[in-house]
């Protein structure tokens, strides 16, 4: 709990799961009995959200150079100096929800609750 200008502001933990069903199970296990919002669940001291699987993907080669749109053995290997990423169209809305929650002033601790394997870690890392 934090005091600001005579008001009590509750600091919150943010839990980020890989998908909605896992987020609901985490919320149940952690006794987060808050209201369900659009893309997250919030209680007095916690927020639970999810990624819906991958929210971000690597850009296709033609984003780096239009000549790479047509596949050719001559252009391999293709190793950019810096990788480019883009949001996946179907889940842009959820990406922006997670982004907004990550940047809230009242969020003081972030728990990554994606799968423990390589893929789960990668899903969160790109967010």
For the regions a protein language model found, what residue spans apply to each?
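Intrinsically disordered, low-complexity regulatory segments
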Residues: 2-127
């Amino acid at each position: 709990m934090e005091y600001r200008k005579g008001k009590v502001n509750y600091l919150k933990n943010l839990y980020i799961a890989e998908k909605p069903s896992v987020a609901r199970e985490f919320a149940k296990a952690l006794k987060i009995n808050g209201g369900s919002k659009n893309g997250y669940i919030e209680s007095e001291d916690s927020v639970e959200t999810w990624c819906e699987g991958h929210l971000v993907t690597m850009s296709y080669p033609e984003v780096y150079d239009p000549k790479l749109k047509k596949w050719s053995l001559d252009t391999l290997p293709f190793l950019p100096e810096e990788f480019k990423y883009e949001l996946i169209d179907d889940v842009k809305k959820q990406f922006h929800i997670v982004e907004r929650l990550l940047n809230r002033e009242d969020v003081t601790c972030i728990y990554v609750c994606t799968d423990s394997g390589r893929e789960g870690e990668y899903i969160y890392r790109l967010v």
